[in-house]
Curated annotation (Swiss-Prot):
Name of the molecule in the record: Glycine dehydrogenase (decarboxylating), mitochondrial
Gene: GDCSPA
Record's subcellular location: Mitochondrion
Subunit structure: Homodimer. The glycine cleavage system is composed of four proteins: P, T, L and H.
Catalytic activity annotation: N(6)-[(R)-lipoyl]-L-lysyl-[glycine-cleavage complex H protein] + glycine + H(+) = N(6)-[(R)-S(8)-aminomethyldihydrolipoyl]-L-lysyl-[glycine-cleavage complex H protein] + CO2
Molecular function in Gene Ontology: glycine binding; glycine dehydrogenase (decarboxylating) activity; pyridoxal phosphate binding
UniProt KW Transit peptide keyword: yes
Length: 1034
């Protein structure tokens, strides 16, 4: 705008000179007034060299710097929100002359990196360059029609769900629904998911998702062990289970000291009396459909629990496992409208009986009531979980796959029971038509057993047939040299079946078509296995079958939930930073979304190139030598990292090294993961400054020198401080024969400033859903890849179907086993982290760490006169997060962290992390992506709440009946005919002036947690039952 104004003035002067020659040419040459500031031009009198005459009056030399010609759509300035001017002002407010002086005072010099430089993308790609690069990678992936099956299927993702959930930041930037009052939308959707699972499996309890089918089966195996109180130590897996599931269970069994036996069903032997459980597949991995009724009766007669891995689409027409007698049912909801994505993310499930509900892993959504007596939803039975029970938890799982569970639930809502049955019958019909056609051809032999969607074929040369299919861009599953399976799905067409006939004809003419023989095909499902029980009878599954209706339902639920679209979510240790649109775009491109994880790797060269680049970049960032991308959650990464350490000790003959030292301040997943590895846990305390007590650690390490396996440590600490003694801590562990496992939860304060490898760690998992921008999705997906030093690289996990290992690959390989169902975990979301790292460049990503630290210190400074800041470093600064101490307020005003969090909802904010790592506190993490204005708004809200608390302390307002205890205040409460509160409706609703311009409203009053657990309901209830319960509690 300014440049245009100056050029216009220059034009007017030229025009005036034409009419008034008395104006001198030197008047036109005053750069300070009329020439663009982009020009280095200097003009003085008649000494100007004239390269070009301007209308005969004077002359001007204009040059443009090369810098000015570079693309302008750079990314770091879009991600890192504080401007250079704001950075200086904020640093000065904290007490430092500039940002770098603050960083120098905060990060210990002993571990500080001089600099970090990428080997690729060091300057950072612009957003348009990044999109072009990802399009180039996508072009290297080949999309073949998949008939591989094995738990992964093509699916038609309804576009209304794709656009309005998977691509919608209103859904994918939400956090796990800890604050139920501003999460009722996704809680309802997850309750829909649980209801869908319980209806289809025929069992009354389901969780709200697990990571994948293989790990869900391993969790079920652990449940069987717990149900039997650890007294029976053998678990039998039927050979008809998916190979990846078998390997995951074998790997997981080591930590529980379980013996896993793989056997044909006919050879199962319970005579030892030592079998805690069995796992079977329904339908089997090669398609066979068996009636397990008598098998299950026999298992139960021998005191053995039965786990059944099943397929949701098949269960729409097959007798449900619960009716067959199964105790636990697991599986994947992937084929309910979630792309294969080269392996994930997908929502798995686990269903069981009421009897075992408290042994279930994962999050469970339950129905409760709010303070007004109206029905409300919440996460139920949280006392089972790792953040409370630590090493005694049912599982280490926390982040699961909520976003994908929501997609699958909406798929069920959209199609309804009749729509799902139609899809299942069509898939079964296509498989039946294919089988009939092969019998008619006579070139191969078709299995005699009944099937649902997968046909098993015996042939002379399976490789030759697979190669013929390859020519038609079709992938088949080669079981062995004489066996092929062909799995059908909802995207298969009748034309595909005709093409398959040509493939299997082996040169013989095909004299019929699929359409011509289809009328002759009979149902292949035995009458005893045909489903008769109705399912999805609740109105929600029977009223949103047009796109308009589903769109409005999705939008209605979204409007109930606070996300990053509305305000910052300052949860400590959660790193709720920007999930940029450019990062998210490739996730839904078909070239990334529609590849089967077991497709030949030559069909996924774009993925493979990205994996290599990402592995190299993560090695640079962390100081490690190799990475595994297989762990598909942070907790899975912890488990994998500890198992790598155990494999290393075992390879050296140190089988006895099983002691793991963990600070009391560690996240609950740390002891839970160590327990899953069969480790003996020893805790060490912290000193008054929140640092690990080094002398106590030294004594513990020396006392267990012969048996020490590892230390688990988070850096910066969970107290939000860079511990000065971290290098000494690592040395103590190494001197006593142990390895250092670093929890990567706080990596956002390390990148570019220090690194786990530089500090002295041997292995570390990265939460890509924290530091590296994968969105939290309302409770998943996540990714937890692990980086290791060279000596641990040979032990990184592999896979039974597609062998994998470290990136870069080590010289030798002795993999520990299999951690996740897919070779590269949730590969579909890796482009998010990859694009973030590549666009930021080494300097931009380093600045992100610096600004995250600046923002935290700025907020701590603003709040310190109102709330005590619990821990600081040696120079009085905090890391990227800090802890506000509310403990004194319980005595002076009866206020606890939950009360402050609920009142923050009235101000339009999600509360910080409550009562962890210190009970009675709030932990705040702003991230680098929040603007100074947003930081100030949040600080203003907390300061205003402190003033409200002061009114309680002074006795001005009632100790128990006040605006904080009454929070949050939803519209229905504020608009009620009767108002009995001792404060005004206006003050309850609008405690800050900015709220009148825009306010996010909670949709329920404070939810009663105790009622929900005492009256556990985890599925949709008939509407009238909700009304009756509300009346009963009113």
């Amino acid at each position: 705008m300014e440049r245009a104004r100056r050029l216009a003035m220059l034009g007017r002067l030229v025009s005036q000179t034409k009419h008034n020659p008395s104006i001198s040419s030197s008047a036109l040459c005053s750069p300070s007034r009329y020439v663009s500031s982009l020009s280095p031009y200097v003009c003085s009198g008649t000494n100007v060299r004239s390269d070009r005459n301007l209308n005969g009056f004077g002359s001007q030399v204009r040059t443009i710097s090369v810098e000015a010609l570079k693309p302008s759509d750079t990314f770091p300035r879009r991600h890192n929100s504080a401007t250079p001017e704001e950075q200086t002002k904020m640093a000065e407010f904290v007490g430092f002359s500039n940002l770098d002086s603050l960083i120098d005072a905060t990060v210990p010099k002993a571990i500080r990196l001089d600099s970090m430089k990428y080997s690729k993308f060091d300057e950072g790609l612009t957003e348009s360059q990044m999109i072009a690069h990802m399009q180039d990678l996508a072009s290297k992936n080949k999309i073949f029609k998949s008939f591989i099956g094995m738990g992964y299927y093509n699916t038609s993702v309804p576009t209304v769900i794709l656009r309005n959930i998977m691509e919608n930041p209103g859904w994918y930037t939400q956090y796990t629904p800890y604050q139920a009052e501003i999460a009722q939308g996704r809680l309802e959707s997850l309750l829909n998911f649980q209801t869908m699972i319980t209806d289809l499996t025929g069992l009354p309890m389901s969780n709200a998702s697990l990571l994948d089918e293989g790990t869900a089966a391993a969790e079920a195996m652990a449940m069987c062990n717990n149900i039997q109180k650890g007294k029976k130590k053998t678990f039998i897996i039927a050979s008809n289970c998916h190979p990846q599931t078998i390997d995951i269970c074998k790997t997981r069994a080591d930590g529980f000291d379980l013996k896993v036996v793989t056997s044909d069903l006919k050879d199962f032997d319970y005579s030892s009396g030592d079998v805690c459980g069995v796992l079977v597949q329904y339908p089997g991995t090669e398609g066979e459909l068996l009636d397990y009724s008598e098998f299950i009766k026999n298992a139960h007669a021998n005191g053995v629990k039965v786990v059944m891995a099943s397929d949701l689409l098949a269960l729409t027409i097959l007798k449900p496992p619960g009716e067959l007698g199964a105790d636990i049912v697991v599986g994947s909801a992937q084929r309910f409208g979630v792309p294969m994505g080269y392996g994930g993310p997908h929502a798995a499930f686990l269903a069981t009986s009421q009897e075992y509900k408290r042994m279930m892993p994962g999050r469970i959504i339950g129905v409760s009531v709010d303070s007004s007596g109206k029905p409300a939803l919440r996460m139920a039975m949280q006392t089972r979980e790792q953040h409370i029970r630590r090493d005694k938890a049912t599982s280490n799982i926390c982040t699961a796959q909520a976003l994908l569970a929501n997609m699958a639930a909406m798929y069920g809502v959209y199609h309804g029971p009749e729509g799902l049955k139609t899809i299942a019958k069509r898939v079964h019909g296509l498989a039946g038509t294919f089988a009939a056609g092969l019998k008619k051809l006579g070139t191969v032999q078709v299995q005699d057993l009944p099937f649902f969607d997968t046909v098993k074929v015996t042939c002379a040369d399976s490789k030759a047939i697979a190669e013929e299919a390859y020519k038609h861009k079709m992938n088949l599953r080669i079981v062995d040299k004489n066996t092929i399976t062909v799995a059908f799905d909802e995207t298969t067409t009748i034309e595909d079946v005709d093409t398959l006939f040509k493939v299997f004809a082996l040169g013989k003419p095909v004299t019929f078509t699929a359409a011509s023989i289809a009328p002759e095909v009979q149902d292949a499902i035995p009458s005893g296995l045909v489903r008769e029980t109705p399912y999805l009878t609740h109105p929600i599954f029977n009223m949103y079958h047009t796109e308009h209706e589903l769109l409005r339902y999705i939008s209605k639920l979204q409007s109930k939930d606070l996300s990053l679209c509305h305000s910052m979510i300052p949860l400590g240790s959660c790193t709720m930073k920007l999930n940029a649109t450019t990062e998210m775009m490739p996730v839904t491109w078909p070239a990334f979304a529609d590849i089967h994880p077991f497709a030949p790797t030559e069909q996924a060269q774009g993925y493979q190139e990205m994996f290599k680049n990402l592995g190299d970049l993560l090695c640079t960032i962390t100081g490690f030598d190799s990475f595994s991308l297989q762990p598909n959650a942070g907790a899975a990464g912890e488990y994998a990292g500890l198992m790598v350490i155990q494999a290393y000790h075992m390879a050296r003959g140190d089988h006895h090294r099983k002691v793991c030292i963990i600070p009391v301040s560690a996240h609950g997943t740390n002891p839970a993961s160590a327990a899953m590895c069969g480790m003996k846990i020893i805790t060490v305390g912290t000193d008054s400054k929140g640092n690990i007590n080094i002398e106590e650690l030294r004594k513990a390490a020396e006392a267990n020198k012969e048996n020490l396996s590892a230390l688990m440590v988070t850096y910066p600490s969970t107290h939000g401080v860079y511990e000065e003694g971290i290098d000494e801590i690592c040395k103590i562990i190494h001197d006593n024969g142990g390895q250092v496992y670093m929890d990567g939860a706080n990596m956002n304060a390390q990148v570019g400033l220090t690194s786990p490898g530089w500090i002295g760690a041997d292995v570390c998992h990265l939460n890509l859903h924290k530091t590296f921008c994968i969105p939290h999705g309302g409770g998943g997906p996540g990714m937890g890849p692990i980086g290791v030093k060279k000596h641990l690289a040979p032990y990184l996990p592999s896979h039974p179907v597609v062998p994998t290992g470290g990136i870069p690959a080590p010289e030798q390989s002795q993999p520990l086993g299999t951690i996740a169902a897919a070779p590269w975990g949730s590969a579909l979301i890796l482009p998010i982290s990859y694009t973030y790292i590549a666009m930021m460049g080494s300097q931009g990503i380093t600045n992100a760490s610096k600004i995250a630290i600046l923002n935290a210190n700025y907020m701590a400074k603003r709040l310190e006169n109102h709330y005590p800041i619990l821990f600081r470093g040696v120079n009085g600064t905090v890391a990227h997060e800090f802890i506000v101490d509310l403990r004194p307020l319980k005595t002076t005003a009866g206020i606890e962290p939950e009360d402050v969090a609920k009142r923050l909802i009235d101000y339009g904010f999600h509360g910080p992390t409550m009562s962890w790592p210190v009970p009675g506190t709030l932990m705040i993490e702003p991230t680098e992506s929040e603007s100074k204005a947003e930081l100030d708004r949040f600080c203003d809200a907390l300061i205003s709440i402190r003033q409200e608390i002061a009114e309680i302390e002074k006795g001005t307002v009632d100790f128990n009946n006040n605006v904080i205890k009454g929070a949050p205040h939803p519209p229905q409460l504020l608009m009620a005919d009767k108002w009995t509160k001792p404060y005004s409706r206006e003050y309850a609703a609008y405690p800050a002036p900015w709220l009148r311009a825009a306010k996010f409203w909670p949709t329920t009053c404070r939810v009663d947690n105790v009622y929900g657990d005492r009256n556990l309901i985890c599925t949709l209830q008939p509407p009238q039952e909700y009304e009756e319960k509300a009346e009963a509690t009113a």
